[in-house]
């Protein structure tokens, strides 16, 4: 029988479950990649990218996903579940590292739902369901915000009265699990030490950038929420707060409508009027699609400039996540606007998606590497066993 740990990443309409084999107290291989998604009135169940079933939705979708998983799990007689790990988007001001979850911790995390209303409820719903169904094992919560606890106070503050800072209205930063994976596995992937002043660009459906100094997060593009920073697939990125006030006061939009607009109808999708998928936009002949891509690139270039200033220089730029690792076109568009940093890209290496894509005489080393949030959670879980 194989000992395994389960890693869960829940969204509003989907649940990703990765199952890793454990040998000699170390994470060995991912043996199952399970994806459940809500599709119109059915829940689709995929195992290792193959659809296994389509079930009519008759109840709460997330609860049904867990039940479908459990039905499948009961048939896996050769697997022994020893722990679960859960991606939790927001850890607030108190959770600066992964924790074993018990009743009080679960209540403390529930209090943070207003800080991440579109992610935290589903993260916690799945966590609580696993707590109920598998009481005899440990359940570990890993936070996207924890990596940024090393940010100095000056980088966290808004220009609001201090009482709001004290209440936790600060810049938290997100995608921390991705940044932790890339920074901690960098030498393993590239055979090089992580340079002192590094900027990591996590570019996917959600995008952010992080300035890392001596291996620690200094500041990042996302702030109080995952809306901040660069433009994303469906999110606005950095937005003048006056726009929100205008939408409410003059466009007569409700806060719910504004939330829907900022999180789900903006970004690449809103600007192009076509898609949030970069591959679709790159293949499009639409002027609006081209403008959306140009704006995406422009905002990223500005953010790299800002983070370079925060670091007082930059030694290394790392692209990661779906777009960052895989789109040679987007990397080229970004780096062509960074010639002032002395960046030079080897077009052949870039087209091949090699890890090191800069030339030997580039003043800043540029890399394109994968991220693996599930694996970094699995490694964190093992520290508790």
From Swiss-Prot:
The cofactor note reads: Mg(2+). Can also accept Mn(2+).
Q: Which GO terms describe its cellular component?
A: cytoplasm
Q: Which residues does ATP bind?
A: 16, 202-206, 277-279
Gene Ontology BP, a term: acetyl-CoA biosynthetic process
Gene3D superfamilies cross-referenced by the UniProt entry: 3.30.420.40
Q: Which InterPro entries match?
A: Ac/propionate_kinase, Aliphatic_acid_kin_short-chain, Aliphatic_acid_kinase_CS, ATPase_NBD
Q: Which cofactor does it need?
A: Mg(2+); Mn(2+)
Active-site residues from the entry: 144 (proton donor/acceptor)
Q: What is this protein called?
A: Acetate kinase
- To which species is this protein native? Rickettsia felis (strain ATCC VR-1525 / URRWXCal2)
Give the gene symbol: ackA
């Amino acid at each position: 029988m194989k000992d395994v740990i389960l890693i869960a990443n829940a969204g509003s309409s989907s649940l990703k479950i990765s199952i890793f084999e454990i040998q000699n107290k170390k994470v060995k291989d991912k043996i199952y990649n399970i994806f459940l998604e809500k599709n119109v009135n059915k829940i689709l169940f995929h195992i290792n990218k193959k659809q296994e079933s389509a079930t009519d939705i008759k109840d709460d979708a997330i609860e049904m996903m867990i039940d479908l998983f459990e039905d499948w799990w009961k048939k896996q007689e050769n697997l022994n579940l020893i722990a679960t790990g859960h991606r939790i988007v927001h850890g607030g001001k108190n959770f600066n590292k992964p924790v074993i979850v018990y009743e009080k911790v679960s209540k403390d995390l529930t209090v943070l739902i207003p800080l991440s209303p579109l992610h935290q409820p589903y993260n916690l719903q799945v966590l609580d369901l696993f707590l109920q169904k598998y009481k005899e094992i440990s359940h570990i919560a890993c936070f996207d915000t924890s990596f940024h606890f090393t940010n100095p106070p000056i980088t966290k503050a808004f220009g609001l009265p201090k009482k709001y800072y004290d209440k936790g209205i600060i810049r938290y930063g997100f995608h921390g699990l991705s940044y932790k994976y890339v920074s901690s596995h960098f030498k393993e992937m590239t055979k090089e030490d992580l340079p002192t002043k590094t900027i990591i660009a996590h570019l996917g459906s959600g995008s952010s950038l992080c300035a890392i100094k001596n291996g620690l997060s200094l500041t990042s593009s996302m702030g109080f929420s995952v809306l901040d920073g660069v433009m994303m697939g469906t999110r606005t990125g950095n937005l003048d707060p006056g726009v929100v006030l205008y939408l409410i006061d003059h466009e007569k939009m409700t806060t719910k409508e504004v939330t829907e607009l900022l999180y789900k109808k903006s970004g690449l999708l809103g600007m192009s009027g076509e898609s949030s998928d970069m591959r679709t936009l790159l293949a499009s002949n639409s002027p609006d699609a081209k403008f959306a891509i140009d704006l995406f690139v422009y905002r990223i270039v500005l953010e790299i400039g800002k983070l370079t200033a925060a670091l007082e220089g930059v030694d290394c730029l790392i692209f990661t996540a779906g777009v960052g690792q895989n789109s040679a076109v987007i990397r080229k568009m970004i780096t062509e606007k960074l010639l002032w940093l002395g960046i030079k890209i080897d077009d052949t290496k870039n087209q091949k998606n090699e890890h090191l894509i800069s030339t030997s005489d580039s003043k800043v080393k540029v890399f394109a590497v994968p991220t693996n949030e599930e694996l970094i959670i699995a490694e964190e879980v093992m520290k508790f066993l």
